[in-house]
A protein has these predicted regions:
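Glycine-rich FAD pyrophosphate-binding loop
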Residues: 1-15
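Short, glycine-/Ser/Thr-/acidic-enriched flexible segments
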Residues: 6-7, 19, 26-27, 182, ...
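Short, solvent-exposed loop/turn and secondary-structure capping segments
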Residues: 10-14, 25, 138, 218, ...
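N-terminal glycine-rich dinucleotide-binding loop that anchors FAD/FMN and/or NAD(P) in oxidoreductases
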Residues: 14-49, 81-88
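Extended N-terminal export/anchoring regions of large proteins
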Residues: 36-79
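An anion/pyrophosphate-binding glycine-rich loop and adjacent beta-alpha core
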Residues: 46-50, 253-255, 259-358
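Conserved redox-cofactor binding core of oxidoreductases
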Residues: 58, 62-70, 80-203, 209, ...
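Glycine-rich loop(s) and the adjacent beta-strand/alpha-helix scaffold that form part
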Residues: 199-203, 207-276
Length: 358
């Protein structure tokens, strides 16, 4: 495994750590929250003509599941509903959008089905490799469409990197840090290795028997590349901040294109609606689930449904004065904040007060 930075982790180490996977037997033990029933009713009444033919059978299965749930649960005993079909349809609808040129994109059915059919198995696989998940609650990351998040016990993505890094080493794998991949080696149409360069300038050439996996995290920290391909956002400013690792600059995409690979959906980058407006850092302030916060603009007005997808939240935020909004929290909500500590919250409060009073 090649890693161009001094340590492995990439964007995973910067995430909230949640894995979205439908596990109804676990989720059904938790009560439904306000608004979830209404979301299901909206899906039940969604225009079938808006659904791609490949997804129709799953959509009709989901409608039957929702009808059964609504008929067999009362307000007193409503539980958190979920199914693989709900995950699949929400993945499809959540990823369906048009760009400024009226070009529509949506998830390839076979790929979405593979994801939603197998992601729970991946959670179990991660558990088998030593990742400990908090089973005391079902998480819902900002911009997710449903409560189905499996969250590791340790903050952010640390458990994945620690345990999977150890797994590679204990199974005779090798990790080369500060080693930048520069070119895929091809024989005919087959990729058989990779050329790389270490931080000291030394060249590295690795030959493989089973190809090369490009797991390089995209290009979210490369503003010029985002601007080059963008067809979705009205504007991506030169000075826009990012929650991404500075390593996420599109290296893998360039490697693939050089080797003749096709690209798809490059104009549709995702923006993260909540981050530090000065630094782009993700985990400052109080980050909690959408059921526990309200977004307000500088005028103190709520301006969006907090349960919406990240693109909807981001577009709504950019329409506010200076692109700034606030997450309203009280002491009870503070206790639910993720990926932070009491000391860190107090330090941020002190810094905020100092910045506004000096």
């Amino acid at each position: 495994m090649l890693e161009k930075f001094v340590a492995i982790g990439g964007n995973t180490i910067r995430t909230g750590g949640q894995v979205n996977a439908a596990e109804p037997k676990w989720q059904n033990a938790f009560p439904a929250l306000a608004g979830e029933k209404e979301t299901l009713i909206q899906l039940l009444n969604h225009d079938e003509n808006d659904i791609d033919e490949a997804y129709i059978e799953d959509f009709n299965t989901l409608k039957r599941q929702i009808k059964d749930y609504l008929e067999n649960s009362s307000n007193e005993d409503e539980y958190l509903f979920d199914s693989v079909e709900l995950h699949r349809i929400q993945t499809y609808l959540g990823g369906k959008r048009k760009d400024r040129n009226n070009v529509e994109i949506s998830g390839d059915y076979d790929l979405v089905k593979t994801l939603t059919d197998n992601v729970l198995e991946s959670v179990y696989w991660l558990k088998d490799k030593g990742v400990h998940f908090d089973r005391s609650f079902v998480d819902m990351p900002v911009g997710a469409l449903w409560r189905r998040g499996h969250k590791p016990m340790k903050a952010q993505g640390l458990e994945y990197i620690e345990n999977l890094g150890d797994y590679v080493k204990h199974n005779h794998g090798r990790i080369f840090t500060e080693t930048t991949a520069e070119k895929l080696i091809k024989e005919g149409n087959q990729v058989v290795g990779i050329e790389a360069r270490k931080a000291n300038g030394a060249k590295v050439k690795i030959h493989t028997r089973h190809g090369v996996v490009l797991a390089t995290g995209g290009f979210g920290a490369n503003t010029k590349m985002l601007q080059q391909y963008n067809t979705y956002w009205d504007n991506i400013p030169d000075d826009i901040k990012t929650t991404n690792s500075p390593a996420i600059t599109g290296d893998g995409i360039r490697l693939g294109v050089q080797a003749g690979a096709d690209i798809v959906g490059m104009g549709f980058s995702q923006m993260m609606p909540i981050s530090d407006p000065k630094t782009g850092a993700l985990f400052t302030g109080l980050i909690v689930t959408p059921s526990n916060f309200v977004f307000v603009n500088k005028e103190g007005q709520r301006f969006v449904n907090e349960f919406e997808s990240r693109d909807v939240l981001s577009k709504a935020a950019l329409e506010q004065k200076d692109g700034i909004f606030y997450i309203i929290a009280d002491a009870n909500i503070k206790a639910l904040a993720m990926n932070t500590t009491e000391d860190k919250i107090n330090q941020e409060l002190e810094a905020s007060f100092s910045a506004t009073t000096c």
